[in-house]
Amino acid sequence: ATELYRQHASNGAQLWMVPANLSSYRDVDALAQWIGNAEVVTSGGTSTLVKPALVPTLLFPFAAGRVAGSLADAGPETESQARLLLWSVERSIAALSAIGTDTNVDHRLHVILPGSPNRGTFGGDGAYGEVKSALDAIVNRWSSEKQWAQRVSLAHPRIGWVRGTGLMGGNDPLVAAVEAAGVRTWSTEEIAHELVELCTEQVRAQAAVKPVEADLTGGLGDNVDLVALRENAAKAAAGQTSEPVEASATIAALPSPATPVQSTAPNWGEFEADL
């Protein structure tokens, strides 16, 4: 973020970096309050405006940790994953879009919802598939829940395979096999360009009428058997490493060093003495 600010920020731009645990509803609410209220420091009878009250324009709720676990592992860990990936996203949209209701009547918060074609396709990724399915429901609720939707516009890209990210980095060894099956994978720079394109004035005008859907799957959801690809890649890797390896020369091990025997404390038994 700091490098992006240094290289591309325009004159007068400001960068604010605020620590927040987005799995905590309390932190989500506190962050919204911090954004929407001015920060003033008073010293010696003089008040200094440190941060003005801000009205959010764009929201990229892309915070995501590593996910793991099968359906059989459903429990507190998957609940924590869903809280970060879904419930905190909904709470953030509601809280941030409400800022400036009295002063910026026609303002809309433009939200880029990070969708995915993954509906359990990979397997073993915890609540991820269920959460991405739930983002489809948020898009549908935009048309039926005007109390928040009238101040929100949605762009819903369904993002496919992005190489080298925290979520997909572990699957990078399968990239060659996936691309051979006809699936396009994205670099982080390529997908960033596509996401920024969803923030233009034209797209935001369209999203004010109805949510904008964007297919960035690269064919990932088109009946691609990822389990079979993973198994075939594992077999190929095992075949490459199954060639006999020439044994290295060995020498007899040196004798073990002598270990001193520690003396045990004598057993004096019980005794009594007058003090």
Where do the model's predicted regions map?
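Catalytic loop of short-chain dehydrogenase/reductase
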Residues: 63-177
